Amino acid sequence: HLGTNRGMETHPVIGFNFRISELHAAIGCAQTRRVPEIIKKNRAIKQQLIQLLSAHKFFSFAALGDSEGDSGTFLNLFLPDTETAKVFVDHLNAQGIGGFNYWYTNMYHFINQWDHITHLRTCSKLPIEVLGAPQDYKSLQLPKTQAIIGRLVSFGIRCTWTDAEVHQLAESLLHAANRI
């Protein structure tokens, strides 16, 4: 803020209020300084998991266009097909393994569950209701995308995992895959 009378700054437009306290700023600076260390740990853990899982016939991994730009935040496993992925996810759930996302059935991140979009349900009128819809969203089909996302299971990687935790996760994933 400017001056000594906090709250007297002008607000040129709605939505811009960048004030933070010195404490928040100090915490933010400290966290930002740790980002390179976190990325390094995440990448190492991701590579370790890939090495531990790569021998299994069910798993394949995405080829990244810029591996140097990968933060190592997620490990994406591709299974042979949607049905195999569903069975694999069921086994993970039965084992109580958390921390993964199966986007194919996710309520927020994939079109299969986007009834509010496909049926254009909103609180107010949409421009396409006035101007016309460029396509019929109710019958929208994305078979290539569904085939890819149906095979994908993603795991969030935590930089705080110990070597034992990484091995335990890999063993649990292999156990679930071997039950298929």
Indicate where each model-derived feature is located.
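Proline-centric
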Residues: 154-164
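Short, amphipathic alpha-helical "lid/cap" segments that border enzyme active or binding sites
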Residues: 29, 163-170, 174
